[in-house]
């Protein structure tokens, strides 16, 4: 069985990679961009939609503000990118926001940021994969109703790809990510060329008239209009998700790590901002519209409740290239695919952050080490399990999942900005020349502006989305935070109990050692255990057997006499046939009789040749060992006997057994 599992593992994941080959797994910028930017770039596929959907609540005229909302979002993106460029240079170890906040604001605030990021990474996978699954069912209507199994299957696929290693994942995802960027770039260029030539057609949705919702009849005027603009702005800020992943993945970059990570950040920010603003500008000039509540839609004065609005990119591709054209199909297909690949950013960020938290004793140790392929395999699988659970619980509904999104990342953004402000304040207290001080002041100004912007977005998101599902995210962050505190407390307690404070006392040997061998009969495994115990020369040795009736007692006594062993036999009665409790009681009584002495218990255990044979045996040795391990002052020794190892070879006795005389 084990060989079959190992073979399957090698087929799916690949052969192990030596630790010294880690340098060859590091990412150049051309691979780092698709790995870490797919999340942020894919947000261009739905951030403009969210802006238009929100503004549409105030009617068609309100959509003219969409470009300006996009510009403000791009400004926030620029400030965040500039801030994170400073972070990757100041803290290049891969801790990202967690390290920044822990160092400058304290461990509790750092743990809060880490909890928010972990939750956000899981949500990123759930939202992106669910969106991709729903997009696939739109292209292939026959798959409708199967969104959950499709989404879970896609998560499993991404898990296997990432388990093969970071570099292989980058190679696998580079082509579709670049194809997406090229497709959007071609659409934008052709769109602007047609705009300047005066032959850019209007979108089909431009013919409709969207009436304002009852709560926004005054349009964008008054406090209601300001609040709606803030909602549109906060919805568009989904475009910022994924920016923080690069700061967590600096160790995966080729040298110089910080410089390459900073350049990748600039590339990401520039591409994402230009794509989003260009799409909103083209949407404005084509008259493109989107609305969630179709009861607000009218055509020539008559209601159109059954109208369907395609996503913004699909509408633009249809308008610019023509509905059903090859370029329309290409843009639509790669956009759907990039939504799936967006989850890959989390598959790189989550395991790296989990490894750092594990190093600091906030998460289980299993998340710290790299796997066979030099990826953090346990972290990858933990992320896959968490995301799959959310997909199943929320039925792969993007509408329900999106309400949970963004909160975690903006908690991280805001506290990271505050941490960097504290970082620059510390630098300003050190002696510096004029140019260095001016540079620090400029850097601090960037973070102050970033703190104000991200804090504002966080407040708006919490106010506008709390009752719609953001409360679940807040609860999850609090739960993860509490669990990590409990894990740290456990590890601190264990460290305190294991720490040697008096070396003289711990060097001392036990005064005397007593031993007993637990047997059910005097078989070959039992005789080996007895021989092992005798070889250790304890001051006292006895054979202990539990008997439940007179027949068993006669049988073991007969074997003992026939063996001629110079070791006393002790029979313990068990009229109720409960072997485990009887053995535990007997061992405890021996310990109480001689508490200053060490008691060694030997248990023979035979090992079967095939995994399925274990089902046929009662595994008494394992049950006894688990119980005896918890008795203070008792040392347990398992003496194994592999079935078939004493078979004669070429008519001669095997010489591999040290217990057999030659």
How would you label these PLM feature ranges?
Residues 1-53, 62, 82, 93, ...:
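Membrane-interface "cap" regions at the ends of multi-pass membrane proteins
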């Amino acid at each position: 069985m084990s060989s079959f599992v190992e073979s399957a593992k090698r087929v799916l994941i690949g052969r192990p990679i030596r630790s010294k080959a880690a340098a060859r797994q590091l990412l150049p910028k051309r691979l780092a961009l698709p790995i870490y930017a797919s999340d942020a770039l894919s947000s261009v596929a739905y951030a403009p939609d969210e802006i238009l959907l929100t503004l549409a609540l105030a009617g068609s005229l309100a959509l003219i503000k969409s470009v300006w909302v996009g510009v403000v979002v791009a400004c926030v993106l620029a400030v965040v990118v500039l801030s994170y460029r400073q972070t990757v240079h100041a803290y290049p170890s891969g801790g990202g926001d967690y390290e920044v906040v822990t160092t400058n604001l304290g461990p509790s605030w750092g743990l809060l940021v880490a909890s928010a990021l972990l939750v956000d990474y899981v949500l990123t996978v759930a939202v992106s994969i669910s969106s991709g699954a729903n997009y696939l069912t739109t292209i292939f209507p026959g798959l409708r109703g199967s969104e959950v199994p499709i989404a879970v299957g896609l998560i499993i696929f991404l898990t296997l790809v990432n388990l093969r290693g970071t570099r292989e994942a980058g190679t696998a995802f580079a082509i579709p990510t670049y194809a997406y960027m090229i497709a959007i770039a071609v659409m934008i260029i052709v769109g602007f060329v047609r705009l300047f030539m005066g032959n850019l057609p209007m979108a089909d949705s431009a013919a409709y008239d969207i009436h304002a919702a009852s709560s926004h009849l005054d349009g964008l005027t008054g406090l209601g209009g300001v609040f709606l603009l803030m909602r549109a702005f906060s919805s568009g800020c989904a475009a910022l998700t994924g920016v923080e992943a690069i700061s967590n993945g600096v160790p995966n970059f080729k040298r110089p790590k910080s410089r390459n990570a900073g350049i990748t950040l600039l590339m990401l920010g520039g591409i994402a901002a230009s794509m989003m603003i260009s799409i909103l500008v083209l949407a404005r000039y084509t008259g493109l519209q989107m609305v969630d509540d179709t009861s607000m839609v009218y055509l020539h004065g008559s209601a159109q409740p059954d109208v369907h609005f395609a996503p913004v990119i699909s509408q633009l591709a249809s308008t610019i290239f023509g509905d059903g054209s090859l370029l329309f199909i290409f843009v639509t297909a790669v956009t759907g695919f990039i939504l799936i690949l967006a989850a890959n950013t989390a598959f790189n960020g989550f395991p790296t952050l989990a490894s750092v938290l594990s190093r600091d004793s906030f998460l289980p140790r299993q998340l710290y080490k790299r796997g066979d392929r030099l990826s953090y395999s346990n972290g990858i699988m933990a992320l896959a399990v968490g995301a799959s659970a959310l997909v199943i619980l929320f039925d792969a509904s993007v509408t329900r999942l999106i309400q949970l999104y963004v909160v975690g990342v903006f908690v991280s953004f805001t506290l990271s900005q505050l941490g960097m402000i504290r970082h620059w304040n510390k630098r300003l207290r050190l002696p510096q020349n004029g140019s260095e001080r001016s540079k620090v002041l400029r850097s601090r100004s960037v973070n102050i502006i970033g703190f104000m912007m991200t804090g504002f977005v966080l407040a708006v998101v919490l106010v506008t989305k709390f009752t719609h599902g953001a409360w679940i995210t807040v609860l999850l962050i609090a739960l993860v935070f509490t669990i990590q505190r409990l894990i740290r407390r456990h590890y601190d307690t264990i460290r305190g109990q294991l720490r040697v404070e008096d070396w003289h006392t711990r060097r001392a040997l036990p005064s005397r050692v007593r031993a007993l061998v637990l047997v059910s009969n005097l078989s070959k495994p039992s005789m080996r255990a007895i021989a092992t115990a005798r070889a250790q020369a304890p001051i006292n040795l006895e054979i202990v057997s539990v008997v439940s009736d007179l027949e068993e007692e006669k049988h073991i006594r007969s074997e003992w006499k026939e063996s001629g062993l110079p070791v006393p036999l002790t029979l313990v009665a068990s009229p109720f046939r409960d072997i485990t409790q009887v053995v535990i009681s007997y061992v405890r009584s021996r310990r109480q009789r001689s508490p200053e002495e060490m008691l060694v218990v030997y248990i023979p255990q035979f090992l079967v040749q095939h995994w399925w044979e274990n089902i046929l045996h009662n595994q008494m040795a394992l049950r006894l060992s688990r119980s005896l391990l918890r008795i203070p002052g008792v040392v347990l020794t398992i003496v194994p006997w592999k079935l078939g190892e004493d078979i004669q070879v070429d008519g001669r006795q095997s010489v591999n057994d040290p217990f057999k005389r030659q």
